[in-house]
């Protein structure tokens, strides 16, 4: 996963450098992606199959708080090897349950210190997991956010809904930037859904 993040960061750096070449100006921005691995709160969301992450199944407030603390530290550390004071300009997130977990996440000290904000649109996934976009508003300004549904070409089950693609348009370093945050269907979904994604 680190290799993918580094490759994406390198691509963004090269892209921004190419735009700036005419002016001989180069800016370095770290960006990333992090799978939150089922960041669920401890409350049931109506209409969602989130029962595995409720107190009856052993998921409790202490585990949730520890996960928030650990995730916030990991996210805040991303990009600090090159940009120790600012870290990532933005980070795509997957497997977040709802606005509440994102509110709780950005209230954690390491992210709150950077005034991190987020974009999230509730999707149709049966389990309730979505993608989100975490960003530093002093480095990236959001212009437009949209959820594009994931459509299977030959889906056998028309009732099968999964997370879509969160698209974010914004501005960074005076340039228009478009980001797509996605989390492809997992092995649990079977080969048809993975391969058609």
Residue ranges and their predicted role:
Residues 1-24:
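Bacterial Sec-dependent N-terminal signal peptides
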Residues 2-3, 67, 163, 187, ...:
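Basic side chains
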Residues 4, 36-39, 137, 173:
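Generic structural motif
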Residues 44-50, 175, 181-197:
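Active-site His/acidic residue clusters
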Residues 74-81, 150-152, 188-189:
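Short regulatory "switch" loops immediately downstream of catalytic or recognition motifs
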Residues 96-185:
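Structured beta-strand-rich core segments of catalytic domains in phosphoester-bond hydrolases
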């Amino acid at each position: 996963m680190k290799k993918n993040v580094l490759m994406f960061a390198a691509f963004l750096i090269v892209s921004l450098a190419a735009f700036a070449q005419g002016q001989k100006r180069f800016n370095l921005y770290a960006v990333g992606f992090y799978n939150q691995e089922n960041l669920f709160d401890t409350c049931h969301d109506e209409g969602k199959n989130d029962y595995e992450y409720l107190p009856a199944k052993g998921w409790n407030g202490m585990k949730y708080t520890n996960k928030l603390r650990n995730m916030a530290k990991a996210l805040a550390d991303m990009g600090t090897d090159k940009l120790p004071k600012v870290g990532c300009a933005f980070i795509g997130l997957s497997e977040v349950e709802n606005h509440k977990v994102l509110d709780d996440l950005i209230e954690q000290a390491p992210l709150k210190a950077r005034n991190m904000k987020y974009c999230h649109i509730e999707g149709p996934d049966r389990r309730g997991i979505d993608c989100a976009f975490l960003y530093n508003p002093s480095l990236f300004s959001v212009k437009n956010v949209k959820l594009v549904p994931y459509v299977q070409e030959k889906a056998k089950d028309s009732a099968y809904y999964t997370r879509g693609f969160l698209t974010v348009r914004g501005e960074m370093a005076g340039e228009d930037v478009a980001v797509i945050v996605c989390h492809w269907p997992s092995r649990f979904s079977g080969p048809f859904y993975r391969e058609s994604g």
